[in-house]
Amino acid sequence: MNVAGEFTTATPIAGLRALGAKPDVLERVSTLRDVRTGAGGVVHAVFTPSISLGQIPLATTITTLEEDETGARLRVVGRRGTQLVDVDLRMDFKSTTDGLTVVNWNAGLIVRGNAASVGQRVARDITMRAIASVLAEAAQVAGSAVSDAHL
C-alpha cells in the first residue's frame, strides 16, 4: 500500500536533516518515547500513534537508507507482538523563497499479522494520518530546537 502527503514547516532543511542524530529532540514528539540511537545510527523508539482504536505502542526502528540536502529515505519498522508495520519512507525537501521548507513524503508500507486482515479497510487512512502527524510534529520540534540553540 502507498500513502503520501505534504506539509510546510518553518524549520530549515538542516534542522530536519539533523533529527536522526538528536534523540533528545525526537523525544519531544508526543507520539515517541524511549528514543535512543543505536549502532549504525539506527534510531529506536516506542511509537504510539493515536488512532480511533485507541493507542497501540509499537517498538520501532528508524534506519536512514539515503540522505542529502534534497531529502531522505528511511526504513521504519514497527512491531507489537506478531503485528508488523514495515515502511519505506521517502521525503523530499524544498526551500521556498520566503524561508519555509516544503516536505513532500511518500511511503510504501506493508502491514503483517492480525492487524493486516482486521484493519485492511482502514489501514490506509490510519497509516496516512499517523505518518503525517509524526512527521509534521517532528519538524515542529526540530524547529524549536534550532530556535533554542540560537538563544
Identify the function of each model-found stretch.
Residues 1-6, 42, 71, 86-88, ...:
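Intrinsic-disorder/low-complexity, polar/charged segments enriched in Ser/Thr/Lys/Arg/Asp/Glu/Gln
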Residues 1-44, 50:
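Hydrophobic ligand-binding cavity/cleft-lining segments
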Residues 13, 37-40, 65-71, 92-102:
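A short, structured loop/turn motif at beta-sheet edges
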Residues 22-23, 126-135:
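Short, well-ordered alpha-helical segments
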Residues 33, 58-66, 87-95:
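Hydrophobic/aromatic beta-strand elements that line small-molecule binding cavities or substrate pockets
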Residues 37-80:
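Glycine-rich portal/gate segments that line the openings of hydrophobic small-molecule binding cavities
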Residues 77-128:
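Beta-strand/loop substructures that line and gate deep hydrophobic ligand-binding cavities in soluble
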Residues 135-151:
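Short, highly charged C-terminal tails/helix-capping segments
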